[in-house]
């Protein structure tokens, strides 16, 4: 009995002084392990009679339970201490400067597109979209292109392997295709713009194989050239934020408009004239191809290159720079996310 009390007291003293879990595990093995002190006491049972074995065995089990409880209590204390130390080590000092966050920016094409759309929205234009891959009817035939028109040639148009109505599919060369689809599927009046990518086999300082267009269409009763001139004039002045900008409409030719015109602008009286867009009254054949009676409805259409307008407004010299991915150039010609116009804000950067 005295030996059991001595073992218990020894265990309490040693475990009380333990400083870490590793040391505690060593004492657990020392007292309760296969060759431990308590296990050694159990070996004495063989030399005792039945009654003594029963009494001694009960005492040994109680000793074992007490030592296990002492170890468990100490283990909980040590685990809490280690957790607190770890939390203290992982503590974040909020006064330390954070890593610099590289914030993205708005590409000038995206910025210019949003500004153009914003201006047209003020004139009541909505937005229509269509597929980039088109068939011959929507891209050429419905728009009054003759079968031998140069625009149909391989050197101007990207043709694909697939076919529709025995004619190859192609990458649309303008977003006028959207106008055809919208007129076929709806009823006049129409007033919308069709922004999107277009594709032509051309590449130099002022042309790229892929570029962005915005084409507009107005179809209604009693529409005339005066309406077209007013919309284009007010649009140009609003986009460039210059009420004194000069415009001139030069006679031109497009298969899908008659009469047709190209619009030139100059910021100041001594500047050279710069061509910025094409426009005209929708050709009666185009209206006929989409099932609209040209004796009842008339309209005008216009088309502009987003990159062209971005170059003029942001003073960018080479069209190819938009697509080169030069980080130095992008850092110079970039816009913050809050610079994108919305219905509540203006256009000034």
Swiss-Prot record:
Chain sites annotated for binding Mg(2+): 258
Name the top EC class.
ligase
Lineage, top-rank taxon, reads Bacteria
Query: GO CC annotations?
Result: cytoplasm
**Compartments in which it is found:** Cytoplasm
Q: What is the cofactor note?
A: Binds 2 magnesium ions per tetramer.
> Keywords of this protein's UniProt record, alphabetized?
Aminoacyl-tRNA synthetase, ATP-binding, Cytoplasm, Ligase, Magnesium, Metal-binding, Nucleotide-binding, Protein biosynthesis
Predominantly, its location class is: cytoplasm
Q: What is its EC number?
A: 6.1.1.20
> Which first-to-last residue range defines the signal peptide?
none
**Which Gene Ontology terms cover its molecular function?**
ATP binding; magnesium ion binding; phenylalanine-tRNA ligase activity; tRNA binding
Which Pfam family name is an example for this entry?
Phe_tRNA-synt_N
Q: Which CDD domains match?
A: PheRS_alpha_core
* Coiled-coil blocks: none
Name the coenzymes or cofactors required.
Mg(2+)
Known partners and oligomeric status: Tetramer of two alpha and two beta subunits.
Question: HAMAP family annotated for this entry?
Answer: Phe_tRNA_synth_alpha1
NCBIfam families given in the database record: pheS
Name of the protein in its database record: Phenylalanine--tRNA ligase alpha subunit
Q: Which organism is it from?
A: Rickettsia felis (strain ATCC VR-1525 / URRWXCal2)
User: Which lineage is the organism of this entry classified under, starting from the top rank?
Assistant: Bacteria, Pseudomonadati, Pseudomonadota, Alphaproteobacteria, Rickettsiales
């Amino acid at each position: 009995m005295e030996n059991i009390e001595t073992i218990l007291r020894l265990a309490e003293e040693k475990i009380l002084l333990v400083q870490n879990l590793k040391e505690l595990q060593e004492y657990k093995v020392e007292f309760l392990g296969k060759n431990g002190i308590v296990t050694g006491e159990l070996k004495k049972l063989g030399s005792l009679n039945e009654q003594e074995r029963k009494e001694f065995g009960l005492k040994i089990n109680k000793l074992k339970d007490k030592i296990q409880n002492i170890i468990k209590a100490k283990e909980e204390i040590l685990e809490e201490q280690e957790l607190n130390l770890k939390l203290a080590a992982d503590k974040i000092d909020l006064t330390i400067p954070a890593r610099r966050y590289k914030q993205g920016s708005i590409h000038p094409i995206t910025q210019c597109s949003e500004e153009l759309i914003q201006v047209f929205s003020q004139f009541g234009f909505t937005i229509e979209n269509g597929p980039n891959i088109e068939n011959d009817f929507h891209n050429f035939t419905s728009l009054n292109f003759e079968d031998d028109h140069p625009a149909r040639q391989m050197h101007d148009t990207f043709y694909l392997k697939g076919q529709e109505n025995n004619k190859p599919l192609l990458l649309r060369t303008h977003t006028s295709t959207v106008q055809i689809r919208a007129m076929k599927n709806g009823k006049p009046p129409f007033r919308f713009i069709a922004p999107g990518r277009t594709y032509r086999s051309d590449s130099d300082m002022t042309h790229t194989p892929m570029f962005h267009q915005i084409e507009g269409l107005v179809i209604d009763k009693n529409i005339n050239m005066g309406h077209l001139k007013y919309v284009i004039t007010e649009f140009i002045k609003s986009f460039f934020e210059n009420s004194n900008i000069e415009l001139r409409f030069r006679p031109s030719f497009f298969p899908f408009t008659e009469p047709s015109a190209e619009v030139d602008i100059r910021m100041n009286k001594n500047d050279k004239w710069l061509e910025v867009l094409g426009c005209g009254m929708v050709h009666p054949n185009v209206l006929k191809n989409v099932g609209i009676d040209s004796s009842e409805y008339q309209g005008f259409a216009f088309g502009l290159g987003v990159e062209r307008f971005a170059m003029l407004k942001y003073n960018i010299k080479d069209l190819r720079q938009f697509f080169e991915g030069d980080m130095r150039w992008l850092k110079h010609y970039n816009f913050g996310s809050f610079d994108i116009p919305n219905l509540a804000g203006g256009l000034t950067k």
